[in-house]
Amino acid sequence: MYEIKFKVWIEKDGKHVLGRGGAEILSAIKSEGSIMSASKKLGMSYRYVWDYIEKMERNLGEKVVIRDRGGSRGGGTVLTERGEELLELFNKIDSAISEVVDELSKED
């Protein structure tokens, strides 16, 4: 029996913006409220997550997160409107393709 596999990613002007790993990062930031907590949840280094976000923003040409520095009042990170849109778009596409792949897999 064969397994059907696929990868989804979003590009802008031929540059990678968001794939499954990036969607997991944005989702974790959304739920955890900080890059540090998100990186711990995902088992990734803070530096890796930070660099990934910076590359995503550079390739997109706009911010996907708003960072509030730590200090006495804490700090945190939230998704921008564009970050929310990208995450929602990725999840819709990934889910739709997953449904098609599941149906095709049942036909074997």
Question: At which residue positions do the language-model features occur?
Answer:
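Short, Lys/Arg-enriched N-terminal segment that forms or immediately precedes the first helix
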Residues: Y2-G14
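Short helix-boundary/capping micro-motifs
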Residues: I29-K40
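Residues within the DNA-recognition helix of helix-turn-helix
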Residues: Y52
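Residue cluster at the C-terminal edge of the helix-turn-helix DNA-binding motif
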Residues: R58-K63
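Basic, amphipathic "hinge/linker" alpha-helix immediately C-terminal to the N-terminal HTH DNA-binding motif
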Residues: R67-F90
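Alpha-helical linker/hinge and terminal dimerization helices associated
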Residues: L86-E107
